[in-house]
Each structure stands twice: as C-alpha cells, then as structure tokens.
Amino acid sequence: EKLFDKAKKKWEDVFNNDEKIKLSPSHLSVCVSSLQNVKLFNSNLEVIDDAFEYLVNKSSKGEKGQYFTPRYVIDMCVKMLNPKKDESMIDTASGSCGFPIHTCFYVWRSIYKERGIEASHLFTAQEKISECQDYVKEKVFGIDFDEKSVRVSKMLNLIAGDGHTNVLYLNSIDFDRWDEWVKDDEDWQDVYFEGFKRLKNLRVTKNQNRDFKFDVLMANPPFAGDIKESRILARYELGKKENGKPQSKVGRDILFIERNLDMLKPGGRMAIVLPQERFNNSSDKYIREFIAQKARILAVVGLHGNVFKPHTGTKTSVLFLQKWDDKLCPKCEDYNIFFATMNEPSKDNSGEKIYYPLLDSHDHLVVKHDLFHPHLEGDEPIKQKDESQEEFDKRIQEYRLNVEKYKDLQKDGIAEAFIEFAKAENLSFWKE
C-alpha cells in the first residue's frame, strides 16, 4: 500500500487519488511474488502489449471493434510515413498508444544518429536527451474515448520514458463537445488540461476543434458500431445524404476517415487501418470518391486475415494518404498508387504469433512477417556488465549464424518497397 501511495503521488495523471488496490492480501501476495523479478523497462513491447491488453475488458473492446495493433504493423506504417523531428503527429484512436510510442522511437533514433550518439534500446528508464524530450512534449499526441485504454497507454508511455501528458481522454468524433467536456469536468482538467492546451495550439483557428495542422496521423479506429446521433452526423460530409440531411446511421470507421483528414494540414500524410469492405463494396464508392477528392492515395497494404486474431478475423488493409497541397502534394488526376499484400501471416489461425527460432539483439523473439526488413545483421547483441568477453564473443557468433541461417530475414519487405516507390515518385516526405 505504501508503494502504491508513492506511485499515486508520482504519477497523478495515471492513478486517481482515491484509487485502491482491489485485491485481497492473499491475491496481492501471489501477484507480487510472480512479478517482483520481472523487468518492464528494456522489455519487449509485444510481451507488454499482451499483458496490458488483459487490463482492458476484452468483451467491451470487442463490442466496440477495438483491438491493439500488432507492433510490426505499427512499425511498417511509421517507416513508410517517415516522420521528422520538426513534425507533429497524432493518433485519433490511440488505444495502447502504439503509433505514438513507435513514432517517438523512430524520431529519437534519427536524433541520436544526427548527433553521433549511440542509441541504446529506447524502451528504457534511461533519461532521453532534451531534444528527444521536447519532441514528445510538443509534437506527439494520442486521443481515445476508452478511459481504460488511455490509462494503459499512459502506463506504457511511462515505461517507455516519453511524455505521457499528451494522451487525452476525448471523443475524437464528437469534437463539438470537447470544450463543454473540459469546462464541466474538474477531474478531467486535473489530469489532461496541459496536454489539451498543447493540442489547441495546433488548431487552424481558435474557438473551433474541427481543423488542425498535424503533419502525420496514424490510427486504427474501431470498426464495430454505427454512429446514429444526427447532431454528430450533421457535422460530417460522409454523415449526410445527397440532399444534405443526416443519414440514419454511419459506420464509426467511415467518420474517422473524414475526421482524420480534418486533423491534417495540407500536405499532411496519414495511415489508417480499415476493413477490407471499404475498398471493395460498391455501396462504399462514395467514400472512395470523397477520399480521392481530399487526398492523394499513396498506398494500400492488405494485411493477412490472421493479424487481429484471436479477437477478430476481419480482413483489413492499411490506407496511406497525403492531403492535397499546392507545394507538398499538388493535385493531379492521374498518378501511380503502391499496392502490396502481406503474404506471411505473422500469426496462426488461433491467433498465436509465429516466431523465428532465434532472438534479436535484446533477446526478444522475432515475429515472422514480410512487412519490413528487421535488419538484424546491423543490430548485434550488446555486451552485458556481468558477461565475460569469451561469453560475449560466443553469443555474437551464434547470433550471426542464426541470422545467416534464415535467408528470408535478409529480404526487403513491403515498407522498403514503398520507400523505393516513394523516392521514384518524388513524394515530399521521402525526398533526399
């Protein structure tokens, strides 16, 4: 209890003041004895995701169509969109905050490389240099309307060592009520006000919460459930009929497409995970036409049907867009689009991840997928403090032999193919 009281004081925006440990002494003893020697810092995000997902009610998430995005899907999106240190980024359905955290990792590595500093494993308690801290504090945001998910993401951000104050408990879709929500909820203000104030600085104009000036947006919005409230539907082009009146209901993910485009500045780019039907159904043609009017379609990457198992077998694709802009993305009618399909399932039919029988440089299992090149050959093990030189040399030799053994680990993946395409197309965010 004393440790928990200290934690509440230190991390006020993660734990409420009146929070109690809701376990009996005997159950608490079992948990502590099992977890006391587990190191979360410098751990594997995949493992931590699996653990933290149990903290979010699975049945309620399933009803909302919300599922944590596998880290390898996140990494593919981040690599393809190539966020920069001077660019702002947001996830409008942030869940466990995978997209923001991995965007931080990607940008931090570029900052360390630029400064000639060797980057350690970034998911650690090690204090980051001021430039990295400033980037997170001013540029990276997450929004989610599931309070448990927000708290989980704050915990993950805390473990990752980045700024968790910009993870906000808000309804991205119902932006008209943000100010009303903030004004009437003192508890909300205590936890989220500073992050909300920074978010407001990125609005296109004051006193409105529709249009923002983000450079990069990545999101995996909930698929299940329709929005039926006419007040909300009336605020969206995709929520109206041809005569201008609100439709009776619209899929939640459909409104997220429009909402996300409104969050981007002209020339801004985004990746959004969508159900495959949005790309194929004849009844969804109006959605595709709306997208083409607002942005350039950069790429469509079909994910394997097992990616979101065991929670759902829904077939999904990732849509990559860049908002039209006279300078960064001049509007045109005829242009090339990158298409790719994930061939390696990454999970079996029961939803268990498929791994290579080898560990990476941080002793983490490597998931078998073809979304990007893992570059294990350039990420060799680091000598441990209590490890002799002989033991270290042996470990490196075994590591190199394993990497050489699995030839498909040497192949470029979908992300690398897109980067080559983007450079050939002279896309603004991949210009050398």
Predicted feature locations:
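Short acidic-aromatic active-site loops that bind/stabilize oxyanions
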Residues: 41, 63-67, 245-250
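Membrane-interface junctions
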Residues: 41, 76, 80-83, 263-266
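S-adenosyl-L-methionine
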Residues: 46-68, 79-82
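Proline-centered turn/helix-capping motifs that create local helix->coil transitions or kinks
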Residues: 40-44, 112, 222-230
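Conserved S-adenosyl-L-methionine
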Residues: 66-198, 211-212, 216, 224, ...
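Residue-level signal for short amphipathic helical patches enriched in basic/charged
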Residues: 43, 84, 303
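A conserved structural/catalytic subdomain of Rossmann-like adenosyl-cofactor enzymes
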Residues: 175, 181-184, 188-432
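Long recognition/docking surfaces used for binding and targeting
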Residues: 1-58
